[in-house]
Amino acid sequence: MPQTSGTMDIAAAARAARAEYERTVTPDVTLDDIRAAAERISPYVHRTPIMESAALSAVTNTRLGLKAEHLQRTGAFKARGALNAIFKLTPEQRDRGVVTLSAGNHGAGLAYAAQIAGVRCVVFMPEHAVPTKVAAVRGYGAEACFAPSMETVFAAMDEYREQHGMHYVHPFGDPDVIAGQGTAGLEIIEDAPDVETIAVCVGGGGLLAGIAVAAKSMKPSVRVVGVEPEGAPVVTRSLVAGYPVTIEKITTVADGLSAPFADPTSQRLIERYVDDVVLVTDDEIISALRMILERTKQMVEPAGAAAVSAFMTGKAGAQEGSRTVATLSGGNVDFEKLKRIL
């Protein structure tokens, strides 16, 4: 069947985007960067435990440990990257203040870090953002601004950034953010040196990229698997396309994994270090969430359960009986939403 002009236009645009990505020089993130970040942020973050669960180990047929980032400062791993980025600002950037976009957890992490450093912080969020996450952003002294949806937040934020001259801290593409998130990977390998597979939840890919750099640099044999919601597959689509893409519509119960666009820096690291990225359904995420709540008594948000769902379904590809670790990425729960989905 001959191609229509519309089909050819789309194909040409994809080829151009792929060529542009291939020409783009992105910053590298190394194990040394991550070790330096760990030293820089250590007074302000928790070294979260890897919690053992006999029940989840039985369900997954692996020896599963849970990296408890829901117990982190601000209730999510995001504080790690935000602190590293804020502490590496130049004096001129500090004076300008920082702005970002977030479904909530990165915004709270950046607000927390900015409060420590005495830097003005503005966070753009979707109007449907979880109220407790909005309250956290404001509670740490940042200004919360809103756009109609997650898909439109970037444009609103970017316009504000231009008007006010603020420094943009990318939620998952800033190399200093990625290095900060990678400190969780350092801890995983140090605390569970026999781990064979690490499953990491994926929104934009900053945590996945950081953990993968750290883990693979320290233990090349370890498998690192990203776990992404089926309704927000921006990293999966970007890997298939061969360049970072934007998705027009996001539909997932895991609001913390709802990035509408990918980034060249994190994508390049994922391509280099990550073994696989798998998709999980909302039902699979909810099933894992229910199991975590019932059997471990840990209060996590849906995004925090995504990595566990990949082991429960077998999608993570772990060998039976092997040592595994899943990230519990956050615990900032919307209780009304929790009642609805459970």
Q: Which positions does each model-derived feature cover?
A:
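PLP-dependent amino-acid enzyme catalytic core
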Residues: 2-342
